[in-house]
């Protein structure tokens, strides 16, 4: 009887060990092993306009590198945000650079209102020579 209990305990212990879920995925910075560093920020140029800047560095040369799009958002209360402008790569060729490992660019927004807060949302983009694509998104705020 003692031997049976030991055997059952061993089987039960083994089944618990094998039933524990284990996460085994690799985590890379910025959601992609393509991106080395990245930054996004707004730069006020007047009381009614600002520049939305992004800087991106890839870990190696890319066929295409930059931003798929940039959105400018505004808020009267700092809680509820609305998109007031969208700049995409199809209409703004400066957002993507080819055959490079780094890219810095900006777009200008010129309809800022007094007493409103502004931020930018950017979707960064990298495409290697094999056609593999990686994206990473981030918000940017006023640097000045």
Give, region by region, the residue ranges found by the protein language model.
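Sec-dependent N-terminal signal peptides of Gram-positive bacterial secreted proteins and lipoproteins
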Residues: 2-24
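Low-complexity, Ser/Thr/Pro-rich intrinsically disordered linker/stalk segments at domain junctions
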Residues: 20-144
């Amino acid at each position: 009887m003692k031997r049976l209990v030991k055997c059952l305990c061993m089987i039960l212990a083994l089944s618990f060990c094998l039933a524990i879920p284990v996460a085994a995925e690799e985590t890379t910075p910025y959601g992609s092993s393509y991106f080395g560093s990245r930054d996004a920020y707004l730069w006020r140029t007047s009381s009614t306009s600002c520049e939305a800047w992004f800087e991106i560095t890839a870990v190696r040369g890319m066929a295409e590198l930059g931003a798929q799009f940039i959105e400018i958002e505004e808020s009267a209360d700092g809680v509820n945000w609305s998109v007031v402008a969208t700049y995409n790569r199809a209409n703004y060729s400066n957002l993507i650079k080819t055959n490079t490992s780094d890219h810095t660019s900006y777009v200008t927004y010129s309809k800022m209102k007094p007493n409103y807060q502004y931020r930018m949302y950017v979707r960064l983009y990298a495409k290697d020579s094999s056609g593999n694509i990686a994206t990473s998104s981030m918000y940017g705020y006023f640097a000045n």
